[in-house]
């Protein structure tokens, strides 16, 4: 039936900040849904707390609310905007849970809002583990034996029926949060306790283990007329027991017989019908026993998911767009498939003539204390996808796209002749970790057979055969050397996915020589199109991947082209903010008449949507892959400053190969990164830097440190996200750092900077054009003091405490730097402002990044100017004046950005903030005063306001004076104070009564006991030096486990306490309303 005419306004709930288990794939689906519904003439209202998303751009919906995603706030939006319907299936678990809350609190009924896309009962039945199991039984489908427990006693009783290992899955949590695998009673008690606490309904499913079974996922789309299609069948290379988000996955499924495939197909459609998903996309997960062939249904998601984003990119079938249209009444046969130019209807099941491999990207290097074993709780932070004509080609392309320094199936570095190392190898095969695939390859190098490896890993023998073949190619190539590389052999190796760099490594040559040889022998890639129909119909959509065959389908045009290099897989320190900038560049330059070419390999993002740019190359971002595309397309310019560190690393090599890099020159980028060259520029401009030195060996580091004085910030050069960065307070600390944390050498020196204690950090984003004109985008004052990585700190725009004189000085310095570096495009500068003895502000320059920074989307939303678009046009040759962007906008309202952390996922990690970036996402709050905006940002970040009760205060000596006002404010608001001896004595001297409590080392009952007993409602805890940090670690960890709000900086505590009275108050404003005020 055609679309419904009884609906006018539709509300879409987004997924909120990026967390592990819920990343940019929901920006992709939400942005698609907004577009699809507006194309049909509906008025769209959107709520999402994450400013770094494309979907929250003011032109994506008729009203965009960057507000907390909780039912209370959404009710205010519903009361104001009066939507007729709510589409909850586009924002992941967050949106589903919020929709259920709205239904349960009677909000939907009160305002007469209809749920479309998924009914309340369907969401309940799919999400509630017990209801789901019963439903499966009713349609004759098998589930693993299990039962639901609401208490530990119930769980222990169920366990006796299902045996060990036991799988525990909490209800209504995201990415398996709180779940796990217990091998004994002690582990069961720990995991169940955690799971009950994290589940909003305090229930967990205790289930029999199907570890080692094969895992499959079916992406199904269903419409109101009960037409069902399977968009894609995805096979997990890793067997059951590893969360599907952490598994290497392959599409189409490789090891199913036709009969098994039909069985899963019928079962998944039966599941959708039973659960009652009337329209839209769902994914159903199955386990198959490799010995008996028993099929069990694991779970289903009644919404678009991470897998549906993958399936969309793998097949070219835009699931979210189609699901949005089905939700308003269309049927599949009424919708056209865009990729084939409308030649086929959307009811045709996609068929693909290539293999797609997805590999997850982990960030365990950021969390050294975390357990790196993969279980049923998701731990990866991003993913990379690659396409090839064979499994091994797509696998090897994906491996080099991961950017973990691997160029193929690199050896793990184990000594395969040592018995100890072989024992390690076997352990790694058995207990999956992030590097398991590389251990599998090493196992074949050590002479193990496919049967041996299967017995340990349970990875299907078909995949193991493929990996064994790659290893044998490698061994032959290493034996034969470069002389044996003729055209047929090279072509065979390239078809198996070998990179030039890996081949060079195997024959002891370098990448350039191999490239020269390959080109001389005319072994070049061709590009094939993703057309969703296995080349049955022609396609006008240029969605391309490389392979080594005969016919090239790229057909480049002779228009003026700009190529944009994306950011690759998400990781901590480089996430959606950079993708946001790439998308904006593509949109702006397309409007200006350029043909835009996007190169990226991250399947979750909007940049890899086939209609974001004119041509999309789904390829790894390595020099080899990018150069081949440049040679074919011959772009007028290539943009490298938008994708974070990934394309920047290639800038110099691209330029050396004659690629036209536009915007700031690679030399200027290098000048800003190279400490010695940069120092000269700073001196020339007469600016101040904290005293710093460069050490090229460990002894030198200790000598130079004495010249500067402690405390120091130490770090390796050239890093993003503050990798391996630390604050050291004394010589023994520094000695340990240069010994353990980094390899110091001439090629990789260590940087020592004097650490500015109690300084205020400030971020400034600017745009410069080719004539040297500068537009200041925004000045942001950080709330946490200097020493906390800028990506982890909350910040306020405009600044809330800096004097106008200091702000003017910051602006003056930024303009000088932009001119000194000849910046064209975006630049981000970080300053620290410290008050000297005379009470004056002294400005220190910390660093300059002549590229897009992670604050660009936040600033753009706050000031109503699309900075990334303006800067892209500057890079393509326009001036700021031509774009009418010459004056800085300083809003009357405050915008606060707050960082979101994954600590709950990693047991054993200290949640204290420091110079290494560890946040995965961000939220934004707007208010008429700084405190009101801060309150809203905290609420959006799910940081709960502490109820009245006991507040615990324990701070380092330098903070004692500064914590007084915070303690006074707590007392005035009705809290009672509890403190450790040192802090307590100080508070009492200053007339504040407080109860004294033991530190952990001082004997029981101590502070951690009080937290465990639920006596403490709020914690202020600052520390200095490694020993003190590890002493107080248990306080912060326990606070996290028991969801007690805590602050690890005095500035953060002050802002939080002052914002308490604004919690949950005030009206909601759409971006459109706020931006209108700016024009007045």
Swiss-Prot record:
Residues 133-328, 679-876 form the ATP-grasp domain. Mg(2+) 1 binds at residues 285, 299. ATP 1 binds at residues 129, 169, 175-176, 208, 210, 215, 241-243, 285, 299. Mg(2+) 4 binds at residues 847, 849. Residues 943-1080 form the MGS-like domain. Large subunit of the glutamine-dependent carbamoyl phosphate synthetase (CPSase). CPSase catalyzes the formation of carbamoyl phosphate from the ammonia moiety of glutamine, carbonate, and phosphate donated by ATP, constituting the first step of 2 biosynthetic pathways, one leading to arginine and/or urea and the other to pyrimidine nucleotides. Residues 1-403 are annotated as: Carboxyphosphate synthetic domain. GO terms for molecular function: ATP binding; carbamoyl-phosphate synthase (ammonia) activity; carbamoyl-phosphate synthase (glutamine-hydrolyzing) activity; metal ion binding. Its EC number is 6.3.4.16, 6.3.5.5. Binds 4 Mg(2+) or Mn(2+) ions per subunit. One of its GO terms (biological process) is 'de novo' UMP biosynthetic process. GO terms for cellular component: cytoplasm. This is Carbamoyl phosphate synthase large chain. Pathway: Amino-acid biosynthesis; L-arginine biosynthesis; carbamoyl phosphate from bicarbonate: step 1/1; Pyrimidine metabolism; UMP biosynthesis via de novo pathway; (S)-dihydroorotate from bicarbonate: step 1/3. Residues 404-554 are annotated as: Oligomerization domain. Mg(2+) 3 binds at residues 830, 847. Belongs to the CarB family. Its cofactor is Mg(2+); Mn(2+). Residues 555-942 are annotated as: Carbamoyl phosphate synthetic domain. Mg(2+) 2 binds at residues 299, 301. The large subunit is composed of 2 ATP-grasp domains that are involved in binding the 2 ATP molecules needed for carbamoyl phosphate synthesis. The N-terminal ATP-grasp domain (referred to as the carboxyphosphate synthetic component) catalyzes the ATP-dependent phosphorylation of hydrogencarbonate to carboxyphosphate and the subsequent nucleophilic attack by ammonia to form a carbamate intermediate.
């Amino acid at each position: 039936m055609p679309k419904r005419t009884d609906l006018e306004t539709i509300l879409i709930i987004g997924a909120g900040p990026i967390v592990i288990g819920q990343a940019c794939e929901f920006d992709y689906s939400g942005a698609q849904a907004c577009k699809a519904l507006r194309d049909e003439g509906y008025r769209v209202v959107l709520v999402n707390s994450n400013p770094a998303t494309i979907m929250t751009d003011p032109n994506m919906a008729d009203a965009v609310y960057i507000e907390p995603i909780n039912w209370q706030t959404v009710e205010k939006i519903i009361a104001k905007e009066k939507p007729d319907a709510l589409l909850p299936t586009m924002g992941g678990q967050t949106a589903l849970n919020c929709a259920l809350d709205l239904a349960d609190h009677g909000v939907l009924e009160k305002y007469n809002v209809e749920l479309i896309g998924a009914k309340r009962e369907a969401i309940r039945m799919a999400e509630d583990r017990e209801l789901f199991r019963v439903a499966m039984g009713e349609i004759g489908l098998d589930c693993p034996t299990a039962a639901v427990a609401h208490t530990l006693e119930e769980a222990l009783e169920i366990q006796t029926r299902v045996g060990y290992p036991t799988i525990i899955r909490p209800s209504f949590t995201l990415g398996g949060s709180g779940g796990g695998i217990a091998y004994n009673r002690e582990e069961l008690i720990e995991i169940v306790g955690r799971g009950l606490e994290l589940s909003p309904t305090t229930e967990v499913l205790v289930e029999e283990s199907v570890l080692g079974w094969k895992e499959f996922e079916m992406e199904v789309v269903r419409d109101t007329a009960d037409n069902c299609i399977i968009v894609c069948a995805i096979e997990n290379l890793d067997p059951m027991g590893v969360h599907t988000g952490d598994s290497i996955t392959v599409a189409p499924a490789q090891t199913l017989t036709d009969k098994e495939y039909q069985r899963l197909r019928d079962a998944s459609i039966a599941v959708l019908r039973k659960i009652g998903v009337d329209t839209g996309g769902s994914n159903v997960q199955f386990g198959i026993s490799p010995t008996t062939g028993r099929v069990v249904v694991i779970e289903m998601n009644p919404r678009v998911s991470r897998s549906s984003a993958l399936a969309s990119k793998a097949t070219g079938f835009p699931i979210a767009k189609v699901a949005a249209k089905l939700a308003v009444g269309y049927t599949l046969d009424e919708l056209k498939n865009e990729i084939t130019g409308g030649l086929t209807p959307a009811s045709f099941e996609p068929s693909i003539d290539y293999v797609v491999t997805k590999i997850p990207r982990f960030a365990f290097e950021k969390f050294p204390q975390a357990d790196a074993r993969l279980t049923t709780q998701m731990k990866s932070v991003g993913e990379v996808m690659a396409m090839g004509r064979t499994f091994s080609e797509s696998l090897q392309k994906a491996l080099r796209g991961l950017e973990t320094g691997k160029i193929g199936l690199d050896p793990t570095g184990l000594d395969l002749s040592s018995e100890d190392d072989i024992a390690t190898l076997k352990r790694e095969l058995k207990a999956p970790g992030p590097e398991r695939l590389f251990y599998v390859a090493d196992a074949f190098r050590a002479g193990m057979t496919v049967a041996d490896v299967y017995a340990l890993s349970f990875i299907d023998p078909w995949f193991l055969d493929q990996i064994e073949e790659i290893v044998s190619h490698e061994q032959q190539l290493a034996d034969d050397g470069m002389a044996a590389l003729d055209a047929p052999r090279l072509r065979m190796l390239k078809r198996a996915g070998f990179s030039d760099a890996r081949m060079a490594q195997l024959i002891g040559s370098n990448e350039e020589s191999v490239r020269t040889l390959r080109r001389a022998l005319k072994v070049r890639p061709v590009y094939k199109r993703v057309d969703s129909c296995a080349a049955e119909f022609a396609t006008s959509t240029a969605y391309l991947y490389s392979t080594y065959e005969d016919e090239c389908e790229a057909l480049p045009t002779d228009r003026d082209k700009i190529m944009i290099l994306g950011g690759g897989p998400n990781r901590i320190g480089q996430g959606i903010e950079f993708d946001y900038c790439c998308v904006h560049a593509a949109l702006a330059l397309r409007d200006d008449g350029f043909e835009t070419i996007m190169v990226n390999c991250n399947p979750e993002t909007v940049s890899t949507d086939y209609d974001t740019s004119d041509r999309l190359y789904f390829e790894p971002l390595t020099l080899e892959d990018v150069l081949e595309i440049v040679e074919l397309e011959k772009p007028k310019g290539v943009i490298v400053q938008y994708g974070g560190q990934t394309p920047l690393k290639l800038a110099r090599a691209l330029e050396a190969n004659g690629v036209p890099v536009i915007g700031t020159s690679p030399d200027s980028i290098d000048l800003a990164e190279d400490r010695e060259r940069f120092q000269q520029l700073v001196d020339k401009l007469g600016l101040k830097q904290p005293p710093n030195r460069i050490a090229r060996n460990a002894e030198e580091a200790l000598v130079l440190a004495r010249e500067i004085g402690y405390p120091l910030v130490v770090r390796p050069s050239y890093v993003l996200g503050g990798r391996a960065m630390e604050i050291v307070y004394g010589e023994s600390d520094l000695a340990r750092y240069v010994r353990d944390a980094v390899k110091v050498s001439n090629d990789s020196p260590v940087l020592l900077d004097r650490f500015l204690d109690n300084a205020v950090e400030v971020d400034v984003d600017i745009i410069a054009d080719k004539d040297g004109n500068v537009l200041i985008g925004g000045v942001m004052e950080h709330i946490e003091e200097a020493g906390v990585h800028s990506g982890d700190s909350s910040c306020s725009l405009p600044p809330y405490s800096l004097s106008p004189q200091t702000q003017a000085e910051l602006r003056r310095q930024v303009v000088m730097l932009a001119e000194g570096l000849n910046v064209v495009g975006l630049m981000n500068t970080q300053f620290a402002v410290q008050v000297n003895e005379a009470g004056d502000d002294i400005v220190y320059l910390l660093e300059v990044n002549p590229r897009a920074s992670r604050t660009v989307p936040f600033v753009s939303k706050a000031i109503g100017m699309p900075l990334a678009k303006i800067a892209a046009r500057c890079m393509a040759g326009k001036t700021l004046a031509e774009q009418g962007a010459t004056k800085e906008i300083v809003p009357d309202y405050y915008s606060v950005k707050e960082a979101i952390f994954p600590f709950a996922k990693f047991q054993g990690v200290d949640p204290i903030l420091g110079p290494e970036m560890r946040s995965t996402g961000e939220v934004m709050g707007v208010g008429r005063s700084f405190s009101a905006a801060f309150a809203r940002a905290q609420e959006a970040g799910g940081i709960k306001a502490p109820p009245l009760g006991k507040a615990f205060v324990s701070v380092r000596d330098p903070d004692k004076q500064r914590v007084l006002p915070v303690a006074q404010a707590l007392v005035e608001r009705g809290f009672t104070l509890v403190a450790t001896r040192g802090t307590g004595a100080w508070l009492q001297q200053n007339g504040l009564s407080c109860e004294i409590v033991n530190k952990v080392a001082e004997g029981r009952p101590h502070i951690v006991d009080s937290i465990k007993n639920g006596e403490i409602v709020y914690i202020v805890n600052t520390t200095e030096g490694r020993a003190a940090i590890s002493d107080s670690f248990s306080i912060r960890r326990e606070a996290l486990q028991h969801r007690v709000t805590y602050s690890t900086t005095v500035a953060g505590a002050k802002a939080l306490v002052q914002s308490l009275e604004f919690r949950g108050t005030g009206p909601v404003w759409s971006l459109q309303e706020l931006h209108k005020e700016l024009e007045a």
